[in-house]
Regions:
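Active-site loops and adjacent core secondary-structure elements that bind or stabilize anionic groups
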Residues: 1
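Glycine-rich loop-to-alpha-helix module at the N-terminal edge of alpha/beta enzyme cores
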Residues: 4, 10, 14-109
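Rossmann-like NAD(P) dinucleotide-binding subdomain of oxidoreductase/dehydrogenase enzymes
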Residues: 76, 105-179
């Protein structure tokens, strides 16, 4: 989406070096995002959780392999982290969030109330009505992912507003999510 109202992503350690130009969303674009999320809500929330979990695990695999180095480079340039900090934040912690969250979701869904003989007590989980709004931080790419993906794993839809100072790495996250 191009609005014509643009901003620049610069390196924190070299403000003269422009990494990217992005289009700022206004009220119209925010409403479009909400409408798109609500349109996807029924299908996404009714998708079996195992299928949603498999998508999350696929994202983790892509981050561990195909996109690991581009995400590291993006975090180093856009958030001024050294290679060790970038590796911990971007792929490692992000992959852990996705894999552990999938495991913990399976435990949540498996946990059922006690049933007396001849009675079946059962808990059925459902997504929230509406959407989750994620306003993600400037300093941790992994948290930017987790604030969106954890609710999505549980069947919710999310509207994501990345920090303007972390748009570079968050753009690559979005590309991985789309794949």
């Amino acid at each position: 989406i191009r609005t014509g109202n643009t901003g620049k992503v610069v390196m924190p350690h070299d403000h003269h070096h422009v990494l990217a130009t992005y289009h700022k969303a206004g009220e119209k674009e925010v409403q479009m995002a909400i409408d798109a999320a609500m349109k996807a809500h029924k299908e996404w929330s009714e998708l079996p959780w195992v299928e949603r979990a498999s998508i999350m695990l696929r994202v983790a695999e892509l981050l561990a392999t195909k996109y690991r180095y581009i995400l590291n480079a993006s975090v180093m340039l856009g958030q001024s982290k050294n290679p060790f900090q970038a590796e911990i934040d971007a792929p490692c912690e992000l992959i852990d969030f996705l894999r552990f969250s999938t495991f913990y979701a399976s435990q949540v869904y498996a946990d059922q109330p006690y049933s007396e003989t001849g009675i079946l007590n059962r808990m059925e989980y459902r997504a929230l009505e509406g959407f989750v709004f994620s306003l993600t931080p400037f300093n941790f790419t992994s948290i930017a992912s987790n604030l969106n993906m954890a609710p999505a794993m549980m069947g919710n839809v999310a509207v994501w507003k990345p920090s303007t100072t972390a748009i570079h790495s968050n753009y690559f996250l979005m590309k991985v999510f789309q794949e």
